[in-house]
Amino acid sequence: MKLAALLGNDTLKQRLSALQAKGKLTHSFLLTGPEGSGRHTLARILCAAMQCTAPGERPCGVCPQCRKVLDGAHPDICIVDDPEKKTIPVKLVRDACTDLYIRPNEGQRKIYLFPRAQDLNQQGQNVLLKSIEEPPPYGTFLLLAEHAEQLLPTIRSRCVELRLSPLPEAVLLRALRERFPDVPEDTLRAAGVRAGGYLGRAESILRDDAGLLPQSAAFVRAYCARRPEELLQVLAPMERLKREQLRPILTQWQALLVSALTSRSGLPPLRPECAQIAEARPVSDITQAIEAIRLALRDLEGNVSPGAICGALTVKLR
């Protein structure tokens, strides 16, 4: 995997190439962009570039160091995360900062990757700050977050931010054609619009649309029929779900509503249910519902309980 594997983002890639040519790849990067924007792809490329032993452009993608990075088997790439915890435990951060002073096993750098840096609490960020300020020569931090503002200003000021951008329509469409050769082009184009130009998001939309969740089918029926009592019957059991169970349901509802809205502008609906929504509800209703679910997904990432979120949606989606 070379830098060219990151689609679009030409300005960002030129900047990285210039830093590399000058030997100035920093010790702290902040990679920002929404889920599906390519943050994780860029992180893998950066890890490989920093460990690559080939002359010329790095990463070469074929040397032993690159292969280990790309296979997820490099001993000097440390992922700091606990997917089962909403907030990254401070102990994990402290352990990483202690481990930082043990020299690399075989690589040129020891890289600490934080795939959910936005889920570091203030205490964890302050612990990390001390190591980011004065790392050993081989120490490197890669922090991934949706927005730079999710981290403390003191952290941001010590990192080089690399912001991922949406792909040009032609680039995105070409990539989707390669990945979904049997899907009609109008459907690919509609997925790209709904994804805001981000490849990973568009791929998720196309995969998720292959099957409608039971809660989504029930939601469409209740929403199109304007029956609040039916909507309550859909949302009430969802109040008992865990956050990770509720998120894909609300994400699919959002996708259905967005497709319904864009179909009013001439884009083909991704599912028949989207056309049903577009026929049953006016644009103002659909727009309000999209905003309600956007806020619900935002609250889901905060401290609001699934019960409170579903209760609010019972009122907002009538």
Label the predicted regions.
Residues 1-49, 65-68, 137-139, 146-252, ...:
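Charged, glycine-rich active-site and insertion segments that engage polyanionic ligands
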Residues 2-123, 127:
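Clamp-loader machinery-focused feature within the broader ASCE/P-loop NTPase space
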Residues 116-120, 132, 148:
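Conserved Walker B
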Residues 126-143:
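Conserved catalytic/switch belt of AAA+ P-loop NTPases
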